[in-house]
Amino acid sequence: MDQSQDLSVSRLANAWAELQAHARDGSALDSDAYRLAFADPEFLLRRETRGIRFQLEMLKPDLGQSEQGIESTVVVFGSARFPAPETASASLAAAEANLAKIQAAEADSAALLDAKDALMVAQRYTRNAYYYDQARLFARLVAEHSNALPLADQLFICTGGGPGIMEAANRGAHELGAPTVGLNIVLPHEQSGNKYITPSLNFKFHYFALRKMHFMMRAKALVAFPGGFGTLDELFEVITLVQTSKAKALPIVLFGSSYWKRLINFDVLIEEGTISPQDLKLFHYVDEPQEAWDIIKTFYQL
């Protein structure tokens, strides 16, 4: 259907209206066999139509970004569990107050142990909120640079759309008025896009594979902050794609050198011959937002 064609005068409108009515008030749908194929959710969710779903999940975010001029992104990965400093401070204050209350009441040992555990978690949140601030500052540097350029030359922050580091990066760019992209994923515990993503660039995926393809399709740089399994999965896929020349070389930045060096001993891989020393040049360690941005600027001679 032509993009400019009004849906209300299209012959496809009836199928859409039927689905809307069914969702709204339970209006009866035509029998499965009589429905138009694209308006039959049960058909589209069959195992045999998985390939079609792949295509749709590839196409929809691609068109959405192209139509809004999003062609070059800086992808920021990192933990969803690192809160904003203000949130961490509030959690710490609440945990300290709760522990003091339990100690004063001379509560049983189980309650005291729980309160101490909660305090340890709150202290960890407070410590890791540092990375939230750093991701936010980094995104501001990208947005500040891009805001002065024509649309075709701008770099846009793209994240996984969730809380924590992802929210921080979207937030930093949003605060300077720049559009930001979020590539959310459907999870058992439902993730909704953070409030700093541009609504028309807030996409949701079912398939991790398609989501990761979209991270790479427009990426001009990747900055990985400390994170867990999801961050590691995304990071190592990018490194592998560049190492094997399946993707063009691009800056890959690991923010927080102490975290990454404690987590992964790449020297072991060299010692065992599973990678070459040259492979360590595929990425950079940094500890400051400006360092990360300088690596990107140098790579592209900005």
PLM regions: where:
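C-terminal functional extensions of proteins
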Residues: 250, 254-302
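Short, acidic/small-residue loops that bind anionic groups at enzyme active sites
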Residues: 177-190, 239-262, 278
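Phosphate/pyrophosphate-binding betaalpha-module
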Residues: 156-225, 229, 236
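Short, solvent-exposed amphipathic alpha-helical segments in soluble enzyme
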Residues: 91-93, 174-175, 237-242, 268-271, ...
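N-terminal, charge-rich interaction modules
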Residues: 2-25, 31-35
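Solvent-exposed alpha-helices and their adjacent loops that cap or buttress functional pockets
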Residues: 66-69, 148-152, 174, 194-196, ...
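Glycine-rich anion-binding loop/nest that anchors nucleotide
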Residues: 220-239, 250-258, 288
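Glycine-rich beta-alpha loop segments
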Residues: 21-24, 28-180
